[in-house]
């Protein structure tokens, strides 16, 4: 099973994970939580700068600042069968700054944000403490399968 990823680079990054790395992270996350593990999905991962992230965050969340990842699940109209999950928007500048401030390996933080965003696309959230603990637990499990340490431990 390989989900179709439309990778859009809308900024000038210094170094990116490979398309295969993005693919592995998405496939592993969705295999862990999908009710139809053999079903393929399509999603867009758009890599943006602070300006675009801030504009989208203000427009859709009324927060006038850039953020690390935004998730826009696709809502399929009744009676139509489409395997579109939605869009992930990852702000490279915020992601890099977080990794540095939290003493995290950049590659591991990339993986975490992609997985975190995928969980949002399939309906997970972290508004309440209970939801946050459930989502974090799933993220930790997925990351462990990829050989990546728990991102919630103090570094």
Swiss-Prot record:
Its cofactor is Zn(2+). Keywords: Cytoplasm, Endonuclease, Hydrolase, Metal-binding, Nuclease, Ribosome biogenesis, rRNA processing, Zinc. The keyword Zinc applies. The keyword Transport does not apply. Its main location: cytoplasm. Its EC number is 3.1.-.-. It comes from the Bacteria. GO terms for biological process: rRNA processing. Binds 1 zinc ion. Pfam families: YbeY. GO terms for cellular component: cytoplasm. Zn(2+) binds at residues 116, 120, 126. One of its GO terms (molecular function) is metalloendopeptidase activity. It is found in: Cytoplasm. SUPFAM superfamilies: Metalloproteases ('zincins'), catalytic domain. NCBIfam families: rRNA maturation RNase YbeY. Belongs to the endoribonuclease YbeY family. PANTHER family: ENDORIBONUCLEASE YBEY, CHLOROPLASTIC. Single strand-specific metallo-endoribonuclease involved in late-stage 70S ribosome quality control and in maturation of the 3' terminus of the 16S rRNA. This is Endoribonuclease YbeY. It comes from Colwellia psychrerythraea (strain 34H / ATCC BAA-681).
């Amino acid at each position: 099973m390989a989900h179709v990823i439309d990778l859009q680079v809308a900024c000038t990054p210094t170094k990116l994970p490979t398309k295969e790395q993005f693919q592995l992270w998405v496939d592993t996350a969705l295999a862990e939580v999908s009710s139809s593990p053999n079903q393929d999905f399509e999603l867009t991962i758009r890599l943006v700068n602070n300006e675009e992230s801030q504009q989208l965050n203000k427009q859709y969340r009324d927060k006038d600042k850039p953020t690390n990842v935004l998730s826009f699940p696709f809502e399929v109209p009744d009676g139509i069968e489409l395997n579109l999950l939605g869009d992930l928007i990852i702000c490279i500048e915020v992601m890099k700054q977080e990794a540095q401030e939290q003493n995290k390996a950049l590659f591991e933080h990339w993986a975490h944000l992609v997985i975190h965003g995928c969980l949002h696309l399939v309906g997970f959230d972290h508004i309440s403490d209970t939801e946050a603990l459930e989502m974090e637990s799933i993220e930790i499990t997925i990351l462990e399968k990829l050989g990546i340490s728990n991102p919630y431990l103090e570094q």
